[in-house]
């Protein structure tokens, strides 16, 4: 395991973690940098950069470069495609979208992106990316056969397969701006079998929801869309407090 992975695991021993997703397409550089500094103050453990619809590589590289010099917490790439592999980040969620119906998103994009991960010196975090439900960008772009929200055992079976493949991270994704979040029941069911680092994202908008997910066994929560409205930093502060208690 590399430095970023070790850092996340040691931070997790203290309390569940908060990851903030900055979509390089939505954020202007200045506002991205300001947001990153704010969330670092609030207690975010990492900034994820990417998203399923982010395709402008130059723009993303520029955002990453600026974020890297602005904050001390790790910058982790979260690519929706090979264009999301850019230099200067600390690590990358090297993800297979395991419930895609298109092999491109399961292994082909990964093969095309891998040489650049090596070239740029990015620490790969081997991740099974599972999209829950349907109707979101990730679902549409990734040709996903969405795991139904009320079928936690299916998510657990995929997570177990991921573990047997040697993946140390599972990311349960309801999708950006999702109307509902992954259920605590699904998180608990996955947690029973998956021994690695469990990330949950999509539709998390308040501290109650956040707390229910970390209580169920999530190691980290990803907050993204909520922060596209800057007035919601207060909500993030509440979420950060709730999951630390």
How does the language model describe each region?
Residues 50, 141-187, 227-230, 235:
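Glycine/Thr-rich beta-alpha phosphate-binding loop at enzyme active sites
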Residues 18-22, 47-49, 75-77, 92-94, ...:
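Hydrophobic faces of well-ordered beta-strands that scaffold small-molecule active sites
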Residues 84-163, 244:
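Conserved anion-binding
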Residues 63-68, 108-109, 225-245:
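C-terminal helical cap(s) of enzyme catalytic domains, especially alpha/beta-barrels
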